[in-house]
Amino acid sequence: MRLAALAPLFALVCAVSGSSQKSGEPLRPEWCRELPRPAYKELARVDVRGNWFEVYRIRPDVYAIYEPHQFEEVISYLIIGQRRALLFDTGLGVASIRDVVTQLTTLPVTVLNSHTHFDHTGGNAEFSDIVNEDTPFSRKNAEGQSNIYSRDALAPERICGSLPAGVRPEAYAIRPWTVSRRIHDGEHIDLGGRALEVLFTPGHTPDSLSLLDGRNGLLFTGDTFYPGPIYLFTPETDFVAYTKSVARLAELAPRLKLLLPAHNVPVSEPDFLIRLDAAVKSVQSGSVKFTVTEGHREYSFDGFSLLLSEK
């Protein structure tokens, strides 16, 4: 997820190398030049069919399913136990994430979303077992999201390379899905030999949650933290709730070995939570300066920034 994703006219200022661009090739926006991110060179890539997703083995039976060709650089996670597997987010829905999952496991798969923004629920409709929070925000989003809302995600300036065959931006929309069961804060999901604790962490959205694998020291943070500009400016964002959620996660940092965020790179150090907690407190107190960027207040810190509405 990148700051320039906020600019509706980004295509007009996007730098494309005309001298090296061959006729008929997809345009390569400026942000494509940053790929691949250096962190991915240190990870074990797993070969899968198709060109839209890249899969990386993060830990035994923990896979990051990465969408590098779209501006948000969304990352979903497949966590495999002895009896079943859990898919934490389903990405943009541009290509079939289910096809990727079935290449990695033959076990039954339960879907749990870190929150219900469209870039994390695009593949939900491919699955029959979906557990989720019960909030008005999540119930509304389960009805699907129209092309009017999501089509900009596939605008040329937000795509690096080519879309999968048959995908048309003007037809792209998020299909509705059915929730099998509602979950609760503190609930444990037993996959068989691996238990995951659900932690409600509202703020980015009312239904944001994180997922803790306490035994292995892994915390899946969703959009509560990722290394990059963290979006906290949408109407559904509650910054006060966000600060409380961050404080909750920061208390876990000494027990953790790894953070697994939902954008950009799939591995971050737990110390980021301590720094994030200090950052949001400095924003609350007014002790840190900001810049105005594309109509938002941006508070910059080492390794991430916070984007709030300009009020």
Predicted segments, located by residue:
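Accessory terminal helices/loops
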Residues: 13, 18-46, 228, 244-311
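Cleavable N-terminal signal peptides
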Residues: 7, 16-18, 215
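Metallo-beta-lactamase
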Residues: 85, 92-93, 172-174, 181, ...
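Short, hydrophobic/aromatic-rich segments at coil-to-beta transitions
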Residues: 59-64, 186, 195-197
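Short acidic-hydrophobic surface loop/beta-edge motif
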Residues: 46-47, 56-58, 79, 186-191, ...
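Active-site HxH/HxHxD metal-binding segment of metal-dependent hydrolases
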Residues: 94-190, 227, 276-289
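Sec-dependent signal peptide recognition
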Residues: 2-9
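Conserved beta-strand hairpin/beta-sheet module of binuclear metal-dependent hydrolase folds
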Residues: 49-103, 211-226
